[in-house]
Amino acid sequence: MQHESPTSGMNMSALRRHKQRLDLADESVAIEVPGLNLFYGDKQALFDIALNIPKQKVTSFIGPSGCGKSTLLRCFNRMNDLVDGCRVEGAINLYGHNIYTKGEEVAELRRRVGMVFQKPNPFPKTIYENVVYGLRIQGINKKRVLDEAVEWALKAAALWDEVKDRLHESALGLSGGQQQRLVIARTIAVEPEVLLLDEPCSALDPISTLKVEELIYELKSKYTIVIVTHNMQQAARVSDYTAFMYMGKLVEFGDTDTLFTNPAKKQTEDYITGRYG
């Protein structure tokens, strides 16, 4: 009797997706996307996305403008729910739980999956109050607890030594790079499991960019990090895994060094060598 392999009934497209996802089978997976489609009204923006994002690693999304990188990133904490007419088909499993389950507590999801945007967005409050903002929302007001959270979050964000004597001054007086690290401190103060970074260095100068990249490297020992970047050199420097997207589709996903030095797809090679995009 001839025995069929587990993949024998798949078409070639499904087989490629299956193999991409199984490449990370030996890793501890934080986010599993088994097959995701997203629509804005009648227009489809993401097409059958399937990938596994490993725990406590840095995964970068690269691709030309409008390819769906940020759209996919915003699915991981359901920020796209805020867009009128947006519809998601499929599942995203965060540590095995589908975050698109009916009745999901989205506020709690966004605590577990924090997000930092490309333009630093500190609140018009003191540095201290920026860091403890999320904790206060959770009803935590004991001064000792807040003080400890401020110190460890700012230290984790490599900002403590620069602001420890200015905690009660306005956060708006910080430089752009300091503001972005403050936003990261504010995000991790509520102890998320995943950090989503949407082009976090695009508005920063090279020195500030280097500090944020060093911070990303330090933070991955505790957090799963997913970063969207237009800067391929940055993706190569900071990430363990890279996904290349084009026109709403996942073209290639794998180990960063391999993807940049020996891509499996010609489309990927053309993009990273500057032939288009």
UniProtKB/Swiss-Prot annotation:
One of its GO terms (cellular component) is plasma membrane. It is a peripheral membrane protein. It holds the Pfam family ABC_tran. Its main location: membrane. GO terms for biological process: phosphate ion transmembrane transport. One of its GO terms (molecular function) is ATP hydrolysis activity. Part of the ABC transporter complex PstSACB involved in phosphate import. Responsible for energy coupling to the transport system. This is Phosphate import ATP-binding protein PstB 2. The gene is pstB2.
